[in-house]
Regions:
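Conserved N-terminal catalytic core of the sugar/cofactor nucleotidyltransferase
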Residues: 6-7, 11-73
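Residue-level detection of beta-strand-connecting loop/turn positions
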Residues: 10, 44, 79, 127-128
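Short beta-strand/turn micro-motifs composed of small residues
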Residues: 33, 77, 101
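Short, glycine/serine-rich, charged loops/turns that create anion-binding
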Residues: 36, 52, 80-81, 104
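Short beta-strand-to-loop acidic/aromatic patch adjacent to the donor-nucleotide binding site
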Residues: 71-81
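Conserved core of the sugar-phosphate nucleotidyltransferase
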Residues: 84-165
């Protein structure tokens, strides 16, 4: 079963995300599918299929939706669980590209027995601007910060253009 369809107390992760988006008045929702796409049957959602899902990463799936990325857009990875305060912070940003990240991320990895820090998608922040998102280790200058990418990106109309033109 795709991770986004995992049931948690009677609701899938994706259903939880969609419910929260609707609470914020976001009703135009597109979901890019891949593995077991026939299992995605939620209503009021438009589905797009990434035929190369097994050989690509999330960015390629996002590019499947490239034509839908115009104007103000919110991109949420389908397999993440988040509090609505994180969504609220991202939505309230006036930046062209706002990325949800956890600057205290290393603490949560220290408490884990398997400690898979190397698997975390890291965000490099220079002067309050995101300049890189990478699963690789990021070299850090003293003035910069590194956070863990939380799988939520808000794009303004200009941010959408920047993303789709690159």
């Amino acid at each position: 079963i795709p991770k986004s369809l995992l049931d948690i107390n009677g609701k899938s992760i994706l259903e939880r995300q969609i419910s929260l988006l609707k609470e914020y008045g976001i009703n135009e929702i597109f979901v890019v599918t891949g593995y077991q796409r026939e299992k995605y049957v939620l209503k009021d959602v438009e589905y797009l299929f990434n035929p190369k899902y097994s050989e690509t990463e999330q960015l390629a799936s996002m590019m499947v939706a490239r034509k839908k990325i115009c104007g103000d857009v919110l991109v949420i990875f389908g397999d993440i669980i988040f509090d609505d305060d994180i969504l609220q912070q991202v939505l309230s940003s006036n930046d062209d590209i706002a990325v949800a990240s956890d600057l205290d991320w290393e603490k949560s990895y220290e408490e884990r027995s398997d400690n898979p820090r190397h698997l975390a998608d890291k965000v490099l922040i220079e002067q309050k601007k995101v300049v890189q998102i990478s699963a690789k280790e990021i070299s850090l200058e003293p003035k910069n910060k590194v956070g863990e990418f939380l799988g939520i990106i808000k794009l303004s109309a200009d941010g959408s253009k920047i993303l789709t033109e690159k």
